[in-house]
Amino acid sequence: MPIIRKNDVVTERPVIIVLYGTPGTGKTSLATTANSPLLIDTDRGFDRAVQRPDIVVTASRWEDIYNAEVIGSYVVEDGKQVWKPGLISECKTIVVDTAKAMLDDYLNAFAIQQDHKLGTNSLKRYGVMGELFKQFVGILRSNNSDIIFICHDKETQEGDNIKHSPDCTGQSKDLLIRIADQVGYICKENGNRVIKFEPQDNRVGKNVADLQDTWIPAYGTEEFDTCMADIIKKVKKAIVNKSDAQAK
């Protein structure tokens, strides 16, 4: 068990970012400007992005994602059991588009497939789904992969106000927000696209790195080509700086 003391130097670690917004705001296109992205496409929409990721995994069930070819598996080498990573080892960023399909559809169906009794016991089913999801994220983290989860925008009426949040069922959404370092809402202002990380009364957000509203550059510019990679760099640097400040 690693132990970190107050004066120890904390190094950069992989981060988890949730991006959500309405259709047409370029969520997938933005996510694939991260470093060396592998896109897990559950919406069959990778061809709508303005550029193609390094690798695209088209998925219609959990087994299309969690398998030896994509994730990896244990193999025996020289009489020892060792972990052999799959396609994830070729990329630095894993993009899941969308998180709702993976969690609410694929993982839900897989859990019931493994134990039919879970079909009538939602509490236990969500517990199993949560453990499978944590295992998936844990493998990606051990691969030093940054992770981006893409969600659609869900609007809910709260009194006279409309609140925006990632479109997932309650428990899945809670799980995503809990493990995320940043949760950003993509919208348009004055014809420009912007990511807002700071939580407000009218939107869900998470801003561990204290990032300001971030304008998304126009397609085809050098700034856009590395936009998500640059955001991830800022998040990692901010987390390390916060940790260093706490040690003083």
Predicted features and spans:
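Glycine- and charge-rich intrinsically disordered segments
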Residues: 1-11, 15-21, 29, 224-248
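Conserved P-loop
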Residues: 2-96, 100-105
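A general structural signal for short secondary-structure junctions and capping/turn motifs
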Residues: 9, 29-31, 85-86, 139-140, ...
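Short, well-ordered coil/turn elements that cap or connect secondary structure elements
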Residues: 34, 52, 142, 177-178
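Short, well-ordered beta-strand core segments
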Residues: 37-39, 147, 183-185
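Conserved, well-folded catalytic cores of nucleic-acid-processing
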Residues: 68-72, 105, 150, 179, ...
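P-loop NTPase motor core
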Residues: 93, 99-175
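Conserved GTP-binding G-domain of TRAFAC-class P-loop NTPases and closely related GTPase folds
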Residues: 154-248
